[in-house]
């Protein structure tokens, strides 16, 4: 018998099985093909706004995605650097082939983990509890817990034009019985849709008609364990390119709108709001004269370019016209045509904050089956599901992150409390406390928590403590370093637009000012540190007031989260509650007053009434 069985070896499944096996649980992962472990069927990249911070959080919790992303990156780019640190995010262009190889090897080397190459027919449920899985050949594998991370493979159809083909992503097979076994147990499913653009042969593109988009020329990384020698040097990194749709492109799309699976009535599932198809963009943003597209390399082993922003479900002949209307792609050869894919997802309102099903005990779900989109969102969920399944086996308290602790916490709270009717994507705007949830401080927020439950090694924890001590010492030294007015200092301040010093002050006081850095003051203080130490001191000092306010605001949330609501509260008979509140509270059954307050349709007077019932 296994402690944990994971169904599906995509980005959620990988982190789930690695988390549970690192916590010394006997784990198995079932995949249709070992060669598809960690595949990237859509964009060949990791990170981006909000999502890049999730990858940093996965690193702080001992996950594998950040390590794999660093070591297989073709380009590193820090985004939003003209804005405040609360929205800085790293994005890497990934080598999708190298990434798959890295992840497959990581799973094969992991202790306490078996890889089973098979199709999973159903989750086996007895007396309301998941007790294992049945494979397509009718083999039963018993397990104390099951984690479903089947991605877009449940009853999936690939759609182009007026044609629907029973298939999973990248011409892989689909499984039609798995979601039925869930529905039979009372779990609600619904249809979602996503899509992917065409891939074209690199050597048939005229890149002189495109704008080069190089990466960031500095050492960047997702994982704190990555060293400079582990990543591709800047001069060897690939360059992406920017182009725009043309009037001819729009004309072709408008002419053939009725041929798109999206608009012909073939698609029943709801598509992603924040990553729409190109035909959807033209309909929704009719006033825009052009849309930007990025030409992105997929792998050093492939001669293909991914056209980011150009997903479509048009027929193949129309796709030929569309692609050839783009600048630089007039004579290109299409290697793989775009498609939309429709699949079954489960209603996340039936999931507890620890990712266990409310309907079937010992069944955990993570990734796109929960209604999310994106590799990073999936990986973050997978890690949490794997950890919580392991904790459930041990009879320990669940591991749940608050909204002020992690973007992963924001995502899971949104899913459990608000649900979703469309593919959910993390955005910085979803986080009320984004100044606390920064790229730079993920380890400070989460690493100790990961260490306490067995996700993070002693070696990694010791390195973290050493780093925190170095930051503390550096702050003290800079606070004690007195800078007196003199001509050199005055000249430095003047070059940055400041008046000369009227009297002496500490280096830390000067660092509060914009543009003044630890390195810039080094010749006056004799103090300089590693780049990440300098960055921490500068962010903590320059944004101290804003960070303090965010922490005060978060305290209110923390107090609300401590106020527990009994699972068996009879909301239907609380006459003072509004009708909508009674219905939604009965369905969602929030665990805390804080969670109840975030349910749409619950008003302050309802919360006041509930506060009297807090146990």
Where are these regions (language model features)?
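Conserved N-terminal/central alpha/beta ligand/cofactor-binding core
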Residues: 18-122, 149-166, 173, 177-178, ...
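A glycine-rich dinucleotide-binding beta-alpha-beta segment and adjacent secondary-structure elements
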Residues: 306-372, 400-413, 531-584, 589
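Glycine-/small-residue-rich beta->alpha transition segments that form the dinucleotide
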Residues: 145, 150-154, 314, 327
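Core beta-strand elements of the Rossmann-like FAD/NAD(P) dinucleotide-binding domain
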Residues: 136-145
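Extended, charge-enriched "interface" segments that sit outside catalytic cores
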Residues: 430, 447-452, 456-608, 612-614
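An anion/pyrophosphate-binding glycine-rich loop and adjacent beta-alpha core
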Residues: 33-35, 180-320, 417-503, 512
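Internal hydrophobic alpha-helix adjacent to the cofactor/substrate pocket in enzyme cavities
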Residues: 378-399
């Amino acid at each position: 018998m296994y402690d944990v069985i994971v169904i599906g070896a995509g980005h959620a499944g990988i982190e789930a099985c690695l988390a549970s096996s690192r916590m010394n649980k006997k784990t198995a992962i079932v995949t249709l093909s070992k060669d598809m472990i960690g595949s990237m069927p859509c964009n060949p990249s990791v990170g981006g706004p909000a999502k890049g911070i999730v990858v940093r959080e996965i690193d702080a919790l001992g996950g594998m995605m950040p390590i794999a992303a660093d070591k297989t990156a073709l380009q590193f780019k820090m985004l939003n650097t003209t804005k405040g640190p609360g929205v800085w995010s790293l994005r890497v262009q990934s080598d999708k082939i190298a990434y798959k190889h890295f992840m497959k090897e990581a799973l094969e080397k992991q202790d306490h983990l078996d890889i089973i190459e098979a199709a999973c027919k159903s989750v086996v449920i007895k007396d309301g509890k998941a007790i294992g899985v049945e494979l397509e050949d009718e083999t039963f594998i018993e397990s104390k817990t099951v984690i479903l991370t089947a991605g877009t493979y449940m009853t999936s159809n690939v759609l182009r034009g007026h044609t629907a083909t029973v298939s999973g992503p990248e011409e892989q097979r689909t499984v039609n019985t798995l979601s039925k076994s869930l529905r039979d147990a009372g779990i609600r499913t619904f249809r979602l849709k996503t899509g992917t653009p065409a891939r074209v042969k690199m050597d048939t593109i005229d890149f002189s008609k495109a704008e080069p988009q190089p990466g960031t020329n500095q050492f960047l990384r997702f994982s704190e364990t990555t060293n400079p020698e582990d990543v591709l040097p800047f001069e060897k990194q690939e360059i992406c390119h920017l182009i725009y749709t043309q009037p001819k492109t729009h004309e072709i799309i408008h002419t053939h709108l009725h041929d798109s699976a999206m608009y012909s009535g073939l698609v029943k599932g709801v598509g992603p709001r924040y990553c729409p198809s190109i035909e959807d963009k033209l309909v929704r943003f009719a006033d825009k004269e052009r849309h930007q597209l990025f030409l992105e390399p997929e792998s050093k082993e492939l001669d293909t370019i991914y056209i980011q922003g150009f997903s479509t479900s048009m027929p193949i002949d129309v796709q030929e016209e569309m692609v050839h209307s783009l600048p630089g792609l007039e004579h290109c050869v299409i290697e793989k045509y775009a498609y939309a894919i429709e699949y079954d997802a489960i209603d996340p309102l039936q999931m507890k904050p620890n990712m266990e099903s409310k309907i079937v005990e010992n069944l955990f779900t993570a990734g796109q089956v929960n209604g999310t989109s994106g590799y990073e969102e999936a990986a973050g969920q997978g890690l949490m599901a794997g950890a919580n399944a392991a904790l459930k086996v041990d009879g320990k308290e669940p591991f749940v992150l608050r909204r002020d602790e992690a973007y992963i916490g924001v995502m899971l709270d949104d899913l459990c409390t608000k649900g979703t009717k469309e593919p959910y994507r993390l955005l910085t705007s979803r986080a009320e406390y984004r100044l606390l949830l920064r790229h730079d401080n993920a380890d400070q927020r989460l690493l100790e928590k990961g260490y306490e439950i067995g996700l993070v090694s002693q070696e990694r924890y010791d390195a973290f403590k050493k780093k925190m001590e170095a930051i503390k010492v550096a702050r003290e030294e800079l606070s004690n370093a007195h800078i007196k007015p003199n001509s050199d200092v005055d000249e430095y301040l003047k070059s940055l637009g400041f008046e000369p010093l009227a009297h002496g002050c500490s280096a830390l006081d000067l660092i509060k000012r914009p543009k003044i850095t630890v390195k810039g003051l080094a010749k006056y203080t004799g103090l300089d540190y590693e780049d990440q130490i300098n960055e921490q001191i500068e962010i903590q000092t320059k944004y101290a007031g804003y960070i303090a306010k965010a922490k005060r605001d978060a305290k209110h949330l923390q107090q609300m989260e401590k106020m527990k609501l009994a699972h068996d509260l009879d909301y239907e008979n609380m006459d003072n509650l509004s009708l909508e509140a009674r219905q939604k509270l009965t369905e969602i059954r929030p665990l805390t007053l804080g969670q109840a307050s975030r349910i749409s349709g619950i008003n302050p007077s309802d919360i006041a009434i509930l506060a009297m019932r807090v146990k």
